[in-house]
Amino acid sequence: MTTENDLLNRIAELETKVAFQEITLEELNQALIHHQLALDKLQTQMRHFAEKLKGAQVSNIASQAEETPPPHY
């Protein structure tokens, strides 16, 4: 009978471990989903900012250093 009890205990322990692994797997899956959503949002923002930079018009006004001084100097 001891062998049968040992086997039952081992089965119960294995079932407990499997249950905890299933919980851990689900938690990891949820974390992965959360991170993927955050990554998608960041990629969308980066594309938006890249398009904004491409669309920015270059100013026709030169900076002070690039301006030639007036003729009376």
UniProtKB/Swiss-Prot annotation:
> Superkingdom of the source?
Bacteria
Signal peptide from the UniProt entry: none
**Pfam families in the record:** SlyX (PF04102)
Family designation: Belongs to the SlyX family.
**NCBIfam families to which the protein is assigned, alphabetical:** PRK02119.1
Q: What is this protein called?
A: Protein SlyX homolog
Species for this entry = Actinobacillus pleuropneumoniae serotype 5b (strain L20)
